[in-house]
Swiss-Prot record:
Gene Ontology BP annotations: taxis
Species of provenance: African swine fever virus (isolate Tick/South Africa/Pretoriuskop Pr4/1996) (ASFV)
InterPro entries assigned: ASFV_MGF360
Family designation: Belongs to the asfivirus MGF 360 family.
Superkingdom of source: Viruses
Chain's role: Plays a role in virus cell tropism, and may be required for efficient virus replication in macrophages.
Record's protein name: Protein MGF 360-13L
Length: 353
């Protein structure tokens, strides 16, 4: 299908224009180059066509724009985005009427999407961790009958990799539940406040999951707010272990230790996940579970760690105050802190190599 010459000219003008006059807006509306109350514009980013449109607050990939247009049953934009180069098979992810399905067939769409295609779309949308992307991903994938059991194995693998130590995935876990937890965790990690509010309005049982995410992503200020002011609490020993499953989490490890968390348990958890920064920070705080830690390291084949923990060269750091409980004070003190015991093991390793 070819575009009318006047539309071709208008598209070129839209692509090239940075600022459009009110008169031009009227023309754009008349010609269908208008979406969600703003002008529709094209731009290029690293050789990829992007749609500049205001409703997400950011540019979106042309293929993703097609998925949205199909979900909205927007016939004219489906055709336009396809003419501009959008892969018509992506439409299969959001088709919700037989009329749209027939249109997409006419434009060359297959009958079904491959698992790899679905997973590729998911990762493409989630590439930029913003509130708009998280909410969009939720709108497209949540309770989507076009997906059925597609890409479940790949998605489980992705969540397990990105949230290693934070979540245990069981075979009985529902896909929708895993998706909500993944999106919420990403919203907490990247401080996407609109997405957090959006998900909390839809799902009312996220308080404990949020606390776990704050521990995992080293968010001490929000953790303090939830624990002391909102009174969302779990066992402090579980908290310090969870903080230890992701490396370089001194803020939340210290915070939980100040609350009474077992620093040796944190040390052993850090060893289990091979989190070097956490291990030696725990020793700085007084952790001394060397024999148990060495046994775990040997069992897992962590040879360097097993050898290191057998050395009699470590001790707690006397310069570390052990009674700070205010997140501002903890953050300020640890901002430029260099682990005493990590420095010792690096120096030892350098000398023997």
């Amino acid at each position: 299908m070819s575009l009318p010459l006047s539309l071709q000219t208008l598209v070129k003008k839209t692509v090239a224009s940075q600022c459009l006059s009110i008169d031009e807006h009227c023309i754009l509306k008349h010609c269908g180059l208008w979406w969600h109350d703003v002008p529709l514009k094209l731009c290029m980013d690293r050789g990829q066509i992007q749609i500049k449109s205001g409703f997400l607050g950011e540019d979106i990939d042309l293929h993703i724009a097609l998925i949205i247009a199909v979900k909205e049953n927007n016939y004219s934009l489906i055709k336009l985005f396809t003419e501009w180069g959008a892969h018509i098979n992506y439409s299969l992810l959001s088709i919700n009427t037989e009329h749209i399905r027939e249109l997409c067939r006419q434009l060359g769409a297959k009958e079904t999407l491959e698992d790899d295609d679905v997973f590729r779309i998911f990762t493409k949308i989630m590439h930029n961790k913003t509130s708009g992307r998280i909410i969009l991903c939720h709108d497209i994938f949540m309770n989507n009958p076009n997906i059925e059991n597609k890409f479940t194995i790949q998605l489980r693998g992705l969540i397990c990799k990105r949230l290693w130590g934070l979540i245990e995935i069981k075979e009985t876990d529902e896909l929708n539940d895993l998706l909500v937890k993944y999106w919420y965790a990403k919203a907490v990690q990247y401080e996407c406040k609109d997405a957090i509010c959006f998900l909390e309005e839809k799902y009312t049982d996220l308080n404990e999951w949020r606390l776990k995410c704050l521990l995992y992503f080293n968010k001490i200020y929000e953790l303090h707010e939830m624990y002391h002011k909102e009174k969302v609490q779990i066992d402090v020993h579980d908290m310090i272990c969870l903080a230890s499953t992701k490396d370089n989490n001194p803020l939340t490890i210290y915070y939980c230790y100040a609350l009474g968390g077992n620093i040796n348990q944190a040390m052993l958890t850090s060893i289990q996940y091979y989190n070097i920064g956490n291990i030696f920070f725990c020793i700085d705080l007084g952790g001394n579970a060397f024999e148990e830690g060495r046994a775990i390291a040997e069992q897992k084949g962590y040879n360097f760690l097993s050898h290191s923990l057998a050395l009699d060269i470590f001790s707690s750091d006397a310069s570390l105050p052990l009674n700070l409980k205010d997140p501002e004070e903890i953050s300020s003190f640890l901002k430029d802190y260099k682990s005493k015991n990590l420095s010792i093991i690096w120096e030892y390793s350098h000398n023997i190599l």
